[in-house]
From Swiss-Prot:
One of its GO terms (molecular function) is nucleoside triphosphate diphosphatase activity. Its main location: cytoplasm. Homodimer. It catalyses: ITP + H2O = IMP + diphosphate + H(+); dITP + H2O = dIMP + diphosphate + H(+); XTP + H2O = XMP + diphosphate + H(+). The gene is HAM1. Keywords: Cytoplasm, Hydrolase, Magnesium, Manganese, Metal-binding, Nucleotide metabolism, Nucleotide-binding, Nucleus. This is Inosine triphosphate pyrophosphatase. It is found in: Cytoplasm; Nucleus. It comes from Yarrowia lipolytica (strain CLIB 122 / E 150).
């Protein structure tokens, strides 16, 4: 089974391929400049999947990530990319400087749309953790400042295997794998 993963983010593509590799699902990537709607992670993911399916006229997969700080009632949330671009890792830490609570939740939502006129299905995963001063190689996104609960390393300090076995993306992809395996079986 082949699915187009609509992303221009090499890190997301690499992680997703690594996690899906055992399934035999063929993932090809296609970069599209989709309108960034505002709303919840679910609303954003659905809008992106529908738009991509309409443009490409085939089954598509899009992914959206959010990082919410408990002290800020879930901010920056789906806007983490823009916060990170504007403030950097140090700025994310400064946002929490006046708060004792440094806990955060990472969300990953994969949205699958089988075609232009089909419903969008969502597959979500979360990972609880803490925002810490940047540590580890800044390999992508906010990995250097997110330390998952129960671990002493940030995502950036972890091996790819460790991170890909516990992350919010892994948890969402585990749900997606079940769906895609069933879909592949039905198409035989």
């Amino acid at each position: 089974m082949s699915v187009v993963f609509v992303t221009g983010n090499a890190g997301k593509l690499r992680e997703t391929n690594h996690i899906l590799a055992p399934t035999g699902i063929e993932l090809t990537s296609h970069k599209l400049d989709l309108e960034e709607t505002q709303g919840t992670i679910e609303e954003v993911s659905i809008a992106k999947a529908k738009a991509a399916a309409k443009i490409l006229n085939k089954p598509v997969l899009v992914e959206d990530t959010a990082l919410g700080f408990a002290a800020l009632k879930g901010l920056p949330g789906v806007y983490i990319k823009w916060f990170l671009d504007s403030l950097g890792h140090e700025g994310l830490n400064k946002m929490l400087a006046g708060f004792e609570d440094k806990s955060a939740t990472a969300w990953c939502t994969f949205a699958y749309c089988g075609g232009p006129d089909e419903d969008v299905l969502l597959f979500q995963g979360t990972c609880e953790g803490t925002i810490v001063p940047p540590r580890g190689e800044n390999n992508f996104g906010w990995n250097a400042v997110f330390e998952p609960k129960g671990y002493t390393e940030t995502f950036a300090e972890m091996s790819e295997e460790t991170k890909n076995a516990i992350s919010h993306r892994f948890k969402a992809l585990e749900k997606l794998k079940v769906f895609l395996a069933e879909k592949a079986e039905q198409s035989k």
